[in-house]
Amino acid sequence: MAKLTKRMRVIRDKVDSTKQYDINEAVALLKELATAKFVESVDVAVNLGIDARKSDQNVRGATVLPHGTGRSVRVAVFAQGANAEAAKAAGAELVGMEDLADQIKKGEMNFDVVIASPDAMRVVGQLGQVLGPRGLMPNPKVGTVTPNVAEAVKNAKAGQVRYRNDKNGIIHTTIGKVDFDTDKLKENLESLLVALKKAKPSQAKGVFIKKVSLSTTMGAGVAVDQAGLNASAA
């Protein structure tokens, strides 16, 4: 059996894996256990009541968190003409067409989000094998293929998170940083859960949001009692 590190022993002793914590208690525990030398992210795992094997029950989308994620996001936009100018004005770091595609093919990928206008997809389509595996391929379902690229850039900069269930029907994303106020983390979590409820597939039956767990980048998961969250989100 592998020897537990001091940090792992502390987490094991502090976190009751059988308990669902009130959101305020859960966040306080995460803050107490966040001892890394950097500001850790607060991540969420949401177990959904779906059959992930069925394509018509998969959940995918994006939402802007009210208090952002605490991350500085670099945005690349494929657009031309007025759309390109609008993207630059909205704060996009990289804007182009074939020239931007050439940079990416060379491995120059200093960005976190890729947005494209519909007419630019003829260029972006050539980059599927590069962008796809990294989760960067623009997609209309998450608002990254859009005629309004300026709005998409602003959303990305404002703290938009994209979500997609994995093969086990679990959504993994981030809701902020461990140094956020508890209320801000709570409101971000509630906002995400509201968005997920709106995205519930009609084919999904029974309880949709089955379990919510929070963790920090280097920490253990803490299950959250949904009763302590906004009723419209639970």
Swiss-Prot record:
Alphabetized UniProt keyword annotations: Repressor, Ribonucleoprotein, Ribosomal protein, RNA-binding, rRNA-binding, Translation regulation, tRNA-binding
Positions of transmembrane segments: none
GO annotation, cellular component aspect: cytosolic large ribosomal subunit
GO BP terms: regulation of translation; translation
Family: Belongs to the universal ribosomal protein uL1 family.
Matches recorded under NCBIfam families: rplA_bact (TIGR01169)
Record has RNA-binding as a keyword: yes
Assembly information from the UniProt record: Part of the 50S ribosomal subunit.
Ranges in a coiled coil: none
Known function: Binds directly to 23S rRNA. The L1 stalk is quite mobile in the ribosome, and is involved in E site tRNA release.
PROSITE patterns: RIBOSOMAL_L1 (PS01199)
Naturally occurring in which organism (per UniProt): Erwinia tasmaniensis (strain DSM 17950 / CFBP 7177 / CIP 109463 / NCPPB 4357 / Et1/99)
Gene3D superfamilies documented for this protein: 3.30.190.20, 3.40.50.790
Gene Ontology MF term list: rRNA binding; structural constituent of ribosome; tRNA binding
Protein name: Large ribosomal subunit protein uL1
